[in-house]
Amino acid sequence: MNNGQICHCGKTGCLETAASGSAAHRVVLEKLKEGHASLLSEKFKSGSDITLEDILDAAHEEDVLAIEAIEEVGTNLGRAIAGLINIFNPELVIIGGCVSSAQDYILLPIKIAVQKHSLSLINRDTKIKISKLGGKAGSIGACMLSRSKLLGLL
């Protein structure tokens, strides 16, 4: 990603700066500063913090700015997934994390970008789905890993 954004790790070019909840948050705040209309405008003008949950709620209420920010993140994520599909040819890609609660608002741009940027012979068999675990996937995975180590399964 060549967006010039500095990641929280201190480097530039990280996928997280363009394809994450924090990226959607940054895009929305930038557009609100430019004066774009949104359901979030009043909250922004009052100086209240806008959270990712606020953005996702606004998207579910058909807020154009929130939807565009999520679509931008989805497109960037789809481009990255396309590269991984070209290399690994997975049968299934599961989208998790808090942004996954955007459902079709993020899934459609991901699928479009994957179709555009991956080899059609390879991506034909790959399914892309939203995790049923949502934002809890990482926590559940960490618990399962700890459990497996504790029980000596790993």
List PLM regions with ranges:
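ATP-binding/phosphotransfer module of carbohydrate and carboxylate kinases, centering on a glycine-rich
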Residues: 3-6, 11-154
